[in-house]
Amino acid sequence: MTLFHFGNCFALAYFPYFITYKCSGLSEYNAFWRCVQAGATYLCVQLCKMLFLATFFPTWEGAVGAYDFIGEFMKATVDLADLLGLHLVMSRNAGKGEYKIMVAAMGWATAELVMSRCLPLWVGARGIEFDWKYIQMSIDSNISLVHYMAVAALVWMWTRYDLPTHYRLPVTVLLGLSMYKAFLMDCFVHIFIMGSWTALLLKAVITGVLSLSCLTLFVSLVHGN
Amino acid sequence: MLEEAGEVFDNMLKASFPLTFIVFLPAVLLLVSPLQAEAAHEFTVYRMQHYDLQGQSYGTRNSVLNTEARTVQADVLSRRCVLMRLADFSFEQYQKALRQSAGAVVIILPPNMAALPQDIVQQFMDIEPEMLSMETQVPVYFAVEDEELLSIYEQTLAASASQGTSSAAEVLLHTATANGFQMVTSGAQSKAVSDWLVTSVEGRLTGLGAEDLPTIAIVAHYDSFGVAPWLSYGADSNGSGVTILLELARLFSRLYTYKRTHAGYNLLFFASGGGKFNYQGTKRWLEDHLDHTDSSLLQDNVAFVLCLDTLGNGDTLHLHVSKPPREGTLQHAFLRELEMIISSQFPEVKFSMVHKKINLAEDTLAWEHERFAIRRLPAFTVSHLESHRSGHRNSILDLRWKVDTQVLARNTRIIAEALTRVIYNLTEKAAPSDLQIFTQQMQVQKEQLDAVMQWLTGQPRAAQLVDKDSSLLSTLEYYMSRYLKDVKFYHVKADKRDPEFVFYDQLKQTMNAYRVKPAIFDLLLALCIAAYLGLSYFAVQNFGLLYKLVQRVSWKPKQQ
């Protein structure tokens, strides 16, 4: 619509990241370059994923409007590389668990925000046509910040050598859930033909529940033993 | 103060976490109501006439448009694009919009014009010349309705109608939920087309006999006219005239191929262009024939010129003359034959002669025969209309369904029979008045008429659109050269210094309707986002509380 509208969307998308960085104490650790490194790792991982997908998953030429469940499932499985990447970032940083998790998640999510949402916002939200999808996209970026924090925490817990055996199962289940979250959401939206706002709300709720369970596990793991 | 606010927030967090989490998003979600976001709609619009004739400007003078849409019900129309539907269109509303200095007018035509009630058709036909008679500074466009355009119209109508009657809160809510539309045309500003050629086609059948045989010219202009050039299909005016002209060419070419029926008259067929612009094509044709060449058929011995105009409907026929024919002339003989044939063979047709003197003070000539009468050639026009002022001749609603093929065939027969009786002098040879010549092998072919009509009305034939290489003209030439000899084109170009007619381009454009929101909506959204960011700031700031809460909850079972 106007530059003002772009400003609105931009603020909605980026300020929560800024706030999180400033208030979580990351800025006091001088963690900026570490976050940038995490972002660079994100880029590498995405490149590898794309190469892999392009090589082994030819474009599906099915009927228009149909949903390729198996293909999408396989693609979601490739997202395993994200978990590896997060682990890589965390293993190269020394420090407390929370610090490692925050650096990895912030770098990762910010890199995603810059790479995948900056351009559409710049092109779309400034156009004449008004569309709610840019506001939705900005809200979605906030959700994905929470999502990556939870995933980073889960990866950290899973890779700990001193993880008690009775924690192993819930952590693995949660990891699997968050990895296939996007795929499951897509299926759900497709089957129940949901509007974009309902889908967004559902995504927020699911991410909230996942991160809350993750936080509970984390808290009891850190302070439990 | 911030601490106090923080405390309140802490308490809220302590009460239940999911509640606060769910408060953030729905706060934004509720303010922005769940509307389906649609892409911009793109549709074709046809601009109103834009031309100068004899130094006078007509129609809309502008083609660029970039304004927000409204309907006439809105309070303020200035610099807005006013949408109107043909079904509830009236000249008063149109004038009201222009008086309030509207930025543009878009008139939405129904997709199926044939289904329009007769009174609306009549009303619009009366309005059309009035719209064109005045010069309009803002662009006026016509669009054909489709589902999306109708939905845009209805949303705009709802938004326009609710203005000024609601409270401030309602207005605020309205800005968030309602859609505005920004109408944008993609084309450039209209400019005069230089060196436009108006083309006419001539063909002839030479009579049998000596050098200076009398000539009968049969003339019909092929171009159409309406409030928007791209919508002018001109079925009755003057597709019907051209159809009859071509059928007469076919019939007489058959008569002229046999020596026994080869008459002593030259027949000159002329499909003129620019007929709706004061008969420019005819004017040039006459100048070429009378002033420039040494000998031509029109110079020596012209029996009469028969103009065909608007003959596809109704049970009346009128012979328009500018001077009543004198007794003993061929003109008079033709009139007598017409009367006799109609009274003896087609009693359902009402026939009359209409006498109207040429008014040189008027801007345009009334009928095509006046062009010839000015040059002292005996001429008349046959038409089913009683007056040249009828809106019927200049309407975009003059479509294929306005022409009845039965009537067209009957009129062709009447004219053909009368012409034949004059050419072969049958009355003086004591042929009976109900002698039917064009029957059996020689009969008027309805399929042929229908096909020609279909072809003519298959495309808009406004003078601005038929350029000299257009398929319409080449097909017309091809058709005429099948039956006639010496078929050739005549071109008219307006004088550079003092042009008699000037056409303008950008008559068809693509218009985009962009969904937009008012500026106040952006402010409202900015407030909501600021509130949300404030909330997330507190949430992050006090994350420790959540942490402790979870710690307490998850430890309790173990202590028991």
UniProtKB/Swiss-Prot annotation, chain A:
Taxon lineage: Eukaryota, Metazoa, Chordata, Craniata, Vertebrata
Cytoplasmic side, ranges: 22-34, 91-100, 158-166, 219-225
GO terms for MF: ribosome binding
Topological type in the membrane: Multi-pass membrane protein
Gene Ontology, cellular component aspect: endoplasmic reticulum membrane; nuclear membrane; plasma membrane
Residue ranges crossing the lipid bilayer per the database entry: 1-21, 35-58, 69-90, 101-126, 132-157, 167-189, 197-218
Record keywords: Cell membrane, Endoplasmic reticulum, Membrane, Transmembrane, Transmembrane helix
Subunit annotation: Component of the multi-pass translocon (MPT) complex.
Main location: endoplasmic reticulum
Name of the protein in its database record: BOS complex subunit TMEM147
Described purpose of this protein according to its UniProt entry: Component of the multi-pass translocon (MPT) complex that mediates insertion of multi-pass membrane proteins into the lipid bilayer of membranes. The MPT complex takes over after the SEC61 complex: following membrane insertion of the first few transmembrane segments of proteins by the SEC61 complex, the MPT complex occludes the lateral gate of the SEC61 complex to promote insertion of subsequent transmembrane regions.
Family matches, as Pfam families: DUF2053
Protein family per UniProt: Belongs to the TMEM147 family.
The UniProt record lists the keyword ATP-binding: no
Lumenal domain ranges by topology: 59-68, 127-131, 190-196
One of the GO BP terms on file: protein localization to nuclear inner membrane
Subcellular localization, as worded in the UniProt entry: Endoplasmic reticulum membrane; Cell membrane
